[in-house]
Amino acid sequence: MIFRKAEASEAETVLALYRAVIGTPFCVWDASYPGETEIQDDLAAGTLYVLERNGEVIGAISIVPENETDDLDCWKVKENVREFARVAVRPDCQQQGLSFYLVDGIIRELKKQHTAAIHIAVAKSNIPAQKLYRKMGFDFCGEADLFGNHYFLCEMIL
């Protein structure tokens, strides 16, 4: 398996991946999000990553170009922080532990960038993601209603 930055030529592949997970258990996305705008913004910022297996993109994750939850009071670290979002694994590849490789790849990338902490908002209904983030060492430090859903707010100090 290869974790790497996405290439511009893979925009349609990533969009198809995002569309494929809509409606699957634990996914709170809809047809309007995430879409082409988020993919193009992430590609332009160099913050879209993919997980490749046997030459096929089977997962995607993004470092958010601009943090969306910085103003929330729950965070212990507020400077030099990055968020990740849009974690997706192709439906036929789910329940194989592949989200771990996506999140681990982002953690390694952000450590290289000397990031102080990572923030993530995880949907309250997404039990598998909550378990993964706890297992990987994220602290659950708050809750918030964002983007029409209820989220747990998680932080990892690097």
Segments predicted by a language model, with ranges:
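Conserved acyl-donor/pantetheine-binding loop and adjacent beta-alpha core of acyl/acetyltransferases
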Residues: 62-86, 94
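Conserved acetyl-CoA-binding loop-helix of GNAT-fold acetyltransferases
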Residues: 89, 95-108, 131-135
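Conserved beta-hairpin
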Residues: 47-63
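Conserved acetyl-CoA-binding loop of GNAT-fold acetyltransferases
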Residues: 19, 134-143
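Conserved GNAT acetyl-CoA-binding A-motif
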Residues: 103, 110-121
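A short beta-loop-alpha structural element at the N-terminal edge
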Residues: 2-14
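Conserved GNAT-fold acetyl-CoA-binding loop/helix
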Residues: 15, 19-41
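Conserved beta-strand-loop-alpha-helix junction that forms the acyl-donor binding cleft
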Residues: 120-130, 146-150, 157
